[in-house]
Amino acid sequence: MTQEKFTKTAWGNRPKSRETPYPIAFKSLKICQNIAEILPMIGATEENRIKNMPAVPPDILPAFEKFGARQRAVLLTLRQMIFDVAQSDPRIGSLEEALRWGEPAYLTSQNKTGSTIRLGVEKTSGLPALFFNCNTSLVEGFRQQFGNALKYSKNRAVLVDTAEGQTNDALRLCIAAALTYHLRKKT
């Protein structure tokens, strides 16, 4: 699929950001004994404060630590995408970062515009995934929109080998669709 197909959809045009948010190797997270050592590595830097990228809250941090290094790196990149998409659309408002089923979850609690997105690893494949409420039509819509450009797990998840390259734009659109799900549902 061409890049244009990823950016012009029913969900609107989205910015094309190719920044790599986490330059640090996350294998070092396990050897850090002190939370104060970990926070600067995952977003509590001046550069990310300028971008409005919040650090991973201390109560959420253990959920990321339970994943393998490669999975954690992909999931943290997806986390940044979620915040980037939310900041690019003023209708979404601020996000609440919480634990759901022991995994990081992102809710539009302020404006209630969207459906919860949860980050985790799909059990069968072992791939990092964006999990969506299975009672929504989100994943079916992604299948229709992106076809084989993305991998799916039933009606609940988009599987992610890597959050870079051409799938980056598709993933951003999936995130935007989830975070604005209730806006479209009302119209």
Which residues fall in each region the model found?
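Non-transmembrane, interaction-prone segments in cytosolic or luminal domains
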Residues: 1-2, 15, 60, 74
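Cationic, amphipathic, low-complexity segments that mediate targeting or membrane/lipid association
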Residues: 2-3, 7-36, 40
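Charge-dense, helix-prone N-terminal extensions
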Residues: 29-187
